[in-house]
């Protein structure tokens, strides 16, 4: 999903590329939602051994409906088209990522590790929880929506209590405002 939203030092490679000897036992799943800014369209695809893909087709055909023909055509155009817009988006995501990472680390109790792609940060807020007397990341997240008017997702929703997820898929101006609100609400 984030194949092109990446700015790490090493080039992105799939598992099949990393372990060619496992190619015939590898299933690669991808989609256009994130890299092509088509979130909500639910267009995905996969590649792998034909017997496994055949089984997946049987399950999929009975459990989900088809994407609209317009969405399918748009996905094909995106996959076959220029990546120039993606590169421009990635530059903007990187700027927002770097700002948000640094700004959160300036807030007492936040510990944010820089990422190499996507458009989320997942800071460790265990010190904030302890210092401010919150029960857990869920209570902190509820507090931030109520007091700072900033929506975050508790890390426990992803199996990582003590963390929160923040998206930077918005303008830098809104990110700065959100950071100020978070900081002010915790002072």
Regions picked out by a protein language model, each given a short descriptive name:
Residues 1-187:
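PLP-dependent class I/II
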């Amino acid at each position: 999903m984030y194949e092109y939203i990446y700015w790490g030092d090493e080039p992105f490679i799939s598992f099949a590329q990393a372990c060619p000897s496992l190619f015939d036992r590898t299933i690669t799943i991808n989609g256009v939602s994130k890299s092509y800014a088509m979130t909500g369209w639910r267009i995905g695809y996969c590649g792998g051994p034909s017997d496994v893909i055949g089984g997946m087709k049987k399950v999929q055909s009975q459990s989900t409906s088809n994407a609209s023909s317009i969405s399918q055509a748009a996905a094909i155009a995106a996959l076959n088209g220029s990546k120039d817009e993606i590169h421009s988006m990635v530059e903007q995501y990187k700027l927002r990522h770097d700002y948000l990472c640094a700004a959160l680390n300036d807030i007492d109790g936040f510990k944010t590790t820089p990422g190499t792609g996507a458009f989320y940060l997942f800071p460790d807020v265990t010190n904030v929880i302890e210092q401010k007397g919150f029960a857990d990341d869920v209570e902190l997240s509820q507090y931030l929506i109520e007091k700072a008017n900033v929506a975050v997702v508790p890390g426990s929703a992803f199996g990582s209590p003590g963390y929160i997820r923040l998206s930077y898929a918005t303008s830098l101006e809104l990110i700065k405002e959100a950071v100020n609100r978070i900081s002010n609400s915790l002072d």
